[in-house]
From Swiss-Prot:
It comes from Schizosaccharomyces pombe (strain 972 / ATCC 24843) (Fission yeast). One of its GO terms (biological process) is isopentenyl diphosphate biosynthetic process, mevalonate pathway. Keywords: ATP-binding, Cytoplasm, Isoprene biosynthesis, Kinase, Lipid biosynthesis, Lipid metabolism, Mitochondrion, Nucleotide-binding, Nucleus, Steroid biosynthesis, Steroid metabolism, Sterol biosynthesis, Sterol metabolism, Transferase. InterPro entries: Erg8, GHMP_kinase_C_sf, Phosphomevalonate_kinase, Ribosomal_Su5_D2-typ_SF, Ribsml_uS5_D2-typ_fold_subgr. ATP binds at V151, H152, K153, T154, G155, L156, G157, S158, S159, A160, A161. It comes from the Eukaryota. The gene is erg8. This is Phosphomevalonate kinase.
Length: 426
């Protein structure tokens, strides 16, 4: 039996940096660029899981499950000693948390069947090579001829989409194996989404070695939403290194208890049909954790000034949300709020000495912002050199004008659009 789940990418159009603080919220748009995970249940009962990602070189991982320790251990097996070791903390920890959610320490469960997983993501997540002379388009899941560690990302949330779709697919597969009530449905209702979301947040944070804002996993699970961060203390005791075995006889019980509850309010949101969202790839790339640390250091050194900036940013987020929810046309108000957000982020860029909106981005964004019909522009999320977004009135001539201007400035328009739905069964 095969179960395939998909999860969307994300763009945080309002709420960068303040979304790290649970007292604020951010406006996240889910994207049609998706991550896909297909889990096939095999007849074998060897206690193994094989995972492959065919878009990359040396992207296959084999894991063995040790049922006798607590928590249950998932460790990588290297079949070919000639190949360079290729640990994948995101995959390994996703398996670790889902297996410990469903099973308790002891013997291998009688219901267990080995699993084979295939991971794929849409092309928009990565910078693509130039088309060959005989090509007019890329295959849906283009082979990138590099390792996973060498790929250049576009900043749309590939790791969050991958880990959420993977945990969703594993969760549904193992639920079918362990459910003795006869219910073999593949439904993803809200209660299932809560558990998958929480498991994905824990696995994602463990793999990154820190508790981030989580809005990327939030969008991957819930789709477009008004996102408020959960309290990091909820999960700190459950974070584990992928390559170390911890000892905790109550781990599975504690995990099940914590992930079964909703951690924070996530309000579904849909971009009004009168607007369109465009994304542009600037072929750069930024280290989000490094940028966040610099801003946090600036906050510590300038508590009053930074709080005023963040409060001002949040007031703009709320205004944008209210404009979108209003039945009236408030284009000029939206334009004013998006421009104010840019000015605040430009100020933080200078004062915190971090490239939230680098000069190269500013010059291009200024050109786009002045075009007729453009509502707002910016560098999403933590900013940097990953991508740009443009919110515009949904009219063909306006869209074509934005795309032409981007191309003239060396920005590649991305084949993505807003997605309202989150995690889904394909």
């Amino acid at each position: 039996m095969k179960v395939t789940c998909s999860a969307p990418g994300k763009v945080l159009i309002a709420g960068g940096y303040i979304v790290l603080d649970p007292q604020y919220s951010g406006l996240v748009i889910g994207l049609t660029a998706k991550g896909y995970a297909s889990t096939t249940t095999l007849d074998d009962k060897c206690g193994t899981v094989r995972v492959k990602s065919p878009q990359f070189i040396n992207a296959e991982w084999l894991y063995n499950i040790d049922w006798t320790v607590s928590p249950i251990r998932v460790h990588q097996i290297y079949e070919n000693c000639e190949l360079e070791k290729n640990p994948n903390p995101f995959v390994q920890l996703a398996l670790f948390y889902v297996i410990n959610y469903f099973f308790s320490t002891g013997r291998q469960p009688l219901c267990w069947q080995d699993l084979q997983v295939t991971l794929q993501v849409d092309n928009a997540y990565y910078h693509q090579p130039q088309l060959k002379p005989d090509q007019t388009s890329y295959p849906k899941f283009n082979f990138l001829n590099c390792t996973l560690g060498q790929v250049h990302k576009t900043g749309l949330g590939s790791s969050a989409a991958m880990i959420t779709s993977l945990i969703g697919s594993l969760f549904l597969s193992l639920r079918r194996l362990t459910d003795d009530t006869g219910d073999k449905s593949l439904k993803i209702d809200d209660s299932t989404k809560v558990i998958v979301h929480n498991l994905a947040q824990i696995a994602h944070c463990s793999a990154q070695g820190k508790v981030g804002s989580g809005f990327d996993v939030g969008a991957a699970t819930w789709g477009s939403c008004i996102y408020r961060r959960f309290d990091p203390k909820l999960i700190e005791q459950l974070l584990v290194p992928y390559d170390e075995q911890i000892k905790n006889i109550n781990f599975s019980t504690e995990l099940r208890k914590i992930v079964s509850k909703k951690w924070s309010d996530v309000v579904p949101f849909q971009l009004p049909a009168t607007y369109c969202l465009l994304m542009g790839d600037v072929a750069g790339g930024s280290s989000t954790p490094g940028m966040v640390k610099k801003v946090q250091q600036w906050q510590k050194e300038n508590p009053e000034e930074s709080k005023n900036c963040f409060d001002d940013l949040y007031s703009r987020v709320l205004s944008i949300k209210n404009c979108f929810l209003s039945s009236e046309s408030l284009d000029s108000e939206l334009q004013s709020q998006f421009r104010s957000i840019r000015r605040i982020l430009q100020r933080i860029t200078v004062e915190a000495k971090v490239d939230i909106e680098p000069l190269k981005q500013t010059n291009i964004l200024d050109n786009i912002e002045q075009l007729p019909g453009v509502i707002g522009v910016g560098v999403p999320g933590a900013g940097g050199f990953d991508a740009q977004f443009c919110l515009a009135i949904n009219h063909t001539e306006i869209i074509e004008n934005v795309i032409k201007t981007w191309k003239d400035d060396g920005v590649v328009p991305m084949d993505v659009s807003p997605a309202f739905d989150g995690l889904a069964v394909e």
